């Protein structure tokens, strides 16, 4: 629709009530419900924070000239939507466009923060949002020592005769060996998320109990690894996608969400072994996650990396009742809060309403959304959270320009992440992880060591300081100033540049 094409995207995520429109490019997910406009020449700006009703809102941005001669940014609240209702179970039959029976019921509130003088810019907006989160949203300032994130894939499955067979990528013994090698190179502070550790591998979801796949070494051996890692100052977390159920491996007849047109929601994976996934109802997620956590914690460990529910919201129907995004948000918030009380919890790219319950932000995005009317790429989220919460990047493995990506890590203060396997990624060719085209430890060992040493040295100068100023100079130069007085100069250009008496070589950085 015409207005939607100008929007930045829905606050939070998916609306299962509706069939998906075919568009050239989906709107971006909005991780934090904020927006703003700055008149830098006049030293005035505002920040808008959607405080209530954000689960069913979108952030709209319309540049001048599109319809009127003003730049506009605002929150649009959705009260009632239309959906496509098939007239029969026959896919070739007709359909009707039907309105939702009831409009959504929620308070709607936007807080505006007005900024002036030196604060009338995007850094001032980020600082204002940070202050709001610390003061009003229960976010605690818990930035800690630098760590490099090294994740492992345990097992996957590939098709074999009438079923599937195991593809073992990284065992418990392999991880011990990798930790020993990295420690001998001076890499001691690590955070690890172990994926595909459970019986029958990565896509055997949901996880209902604490049972490790025997091919990686079994439950007892995994438990010992987690405990031993902790004694070496390595934080090892087990990965759990609490949202999805694999209908090829688990009974998905009940407890899965349906769209309002009564059709079961199916997420297409575009992979060969398991082509679709379903979503669990939030009530079922609560039941299964509590069951897993109870058995996991009882074993004497409790580091958990939660995915799926951390960055997905939807409306759905179940057993004849309709549940809104507000219902899902409230349920997920309770689930995550309860999990955080029982475990040491980290969340995968969490929405803002869950930030107070996570010890770290996994998969922090570092690049722009690439909208045509964008002028500059601003690392807004990392400016907000730097010095408040440890942030870990998306995987270095899959970045085409690793030199530029490294400088992004320097600019944002985000810690590096690697997705590692002991075996060659060629073994994953016929699995659902076929998109992991480069992961072998021997390929990335030197890079892990290099990133660790250089970025740790930078962190020791910055410590737990927050960003007080972020400047863009002549497109290629970024200047980041921290609250402890340290300034970092980054040069993305092809030529050496001198700024403030500091010479920065091409594709390099300097710290003062």
Where do the protein language model's features map onto the residues?
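Active-site-proximal substrate-binding groove within the catalytic cores of carbohydrate-active enzymes
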Residues: 18, 25-27, 31-73, 85-88, ...
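Terminal accessory/anchoring regions of large secretory-pathway or extracellular enzymes
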Residues: 113-151, 155-191, 434-457, 461-464, ...
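Extended acidic/polar, glycine-enriched regions
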Residues: 10-139
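Aromatic-lined carbohydrate-binding/catalytic grooves of carbohydrate-active enzymes
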Residues: 143-227, 232-287
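Single conserved hydrophobic/aromatic residue that forms the stacking wall/gate
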Residues: 1-12
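Glycine-centered small-residue hotspots that permit tight backbone geometry or close packing
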Residues: 7, 213-220, 387, 502, ...
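Short loop/turn motifs at secondary-structure junctions
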Residues: 7, 186-189, 299-300
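Structural preference for beta-strand elements that scaffold enzyme active sites
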Residues: 189-191, 235-237, 302-305, 344-346
């Amino acid at each position: 629709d015409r207005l939607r094409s100008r929007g930045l995207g829905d606050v939070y995520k998916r609306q299962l009530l509706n069939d998906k429109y075919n568009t050239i490019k989906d709107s971006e997910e909005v991780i934090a419900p904020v927006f703003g406009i700055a008149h830098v020449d006049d030293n005035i700006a505002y920040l808008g924070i959607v405080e209530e009703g954000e689960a069913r809102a979108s952030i709209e941005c319309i540049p001048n000239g599109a319809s009127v001669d003003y730049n506009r940014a605002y929150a649009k609240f959705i009260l009632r939507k239309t959906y496509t209702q098939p007239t029969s179970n026959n896919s070739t039959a007709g359909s009707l466009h039907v309105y939702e029976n009831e409009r959504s019921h929620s308070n709607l509130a936007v807080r505006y923060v007005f900024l002036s003088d030196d604060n009338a810019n995007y850094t001032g907006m980020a600082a204002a949002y940070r202050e709001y989160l610390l003061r009003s949203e229960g976010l605690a300032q818990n930035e800690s020592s630098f760590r490099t994130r090294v994740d492992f894939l345990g097992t996957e499955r590939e098709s074999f005769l009438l079923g599937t067979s195991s593809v073992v990528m990284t065992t418990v013994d392999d991880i011990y060996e990798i930790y020993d090698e990295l420690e001998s190179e001076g890499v001691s502070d690590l955070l690890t998320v172990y994926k595909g550790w459970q019986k029958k591998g990565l896509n055997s979801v949901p996880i209902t109990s604490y049972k490790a796949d025997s091919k990686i070494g079994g439950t007892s051996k995994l438990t010992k690894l987690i405990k031993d890692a902790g004694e070496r100052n390595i934080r090892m977390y087990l990965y759990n996608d609490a949202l999805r159920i694999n209908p090829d491996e688990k009974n998905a007849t009940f407890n899965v969400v349906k769209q309002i047109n009564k059709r079961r929601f199916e997420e297409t994976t575009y992979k060969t072994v398991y082509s679709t996934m379903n979503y669990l109802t939030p009530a079922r997620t609560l039941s299964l996650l509590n069951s897993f956590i109870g058995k996991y914690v009882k074993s004497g460990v409790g580091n958990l990396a939660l995915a799926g529910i951390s960055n997905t919201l939807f409306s759905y129907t179940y057993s004849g009742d309709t549940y809104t995004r507000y219902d899902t948000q409230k349920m997920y918030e309770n689930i995550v809060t309860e999990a955080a009380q029982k475990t040491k919890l980290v969340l995968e790219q969490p929405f803002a309403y869950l930030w107070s319950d996570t010890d770290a932000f996994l998969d922090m995005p570092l690049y722009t959304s690439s909208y045509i009317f964008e002028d500059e790429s601003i690392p807004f989220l990392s400016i907000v959270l730097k010095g408040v919460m440890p942030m870990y990047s998306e995987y270095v493995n899959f970045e085409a320009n690793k030199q530029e990506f490294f400088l992004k890590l320097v600019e944002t203060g985000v810690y590096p992440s690697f997705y590692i396997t002991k075996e060659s990624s060629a073994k994953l060719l016929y699995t659902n992880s076929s998109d992991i085209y480069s992961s072998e430890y021997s390929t990335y060992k030197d890079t892990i060591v290099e990133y660790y040493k250089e970025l740790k040295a930078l962190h020791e100068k910055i410590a737990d300081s927050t960003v007080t100023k972020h400047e863009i100079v002549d497109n290629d130069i970024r200047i980041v100033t921290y609250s402890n007085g340290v300034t970092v100069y980054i040069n993305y250009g092809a030529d050496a540049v001198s700024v403030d008496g500091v010479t920065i070589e091409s594709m390099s950085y300097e710290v003062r």
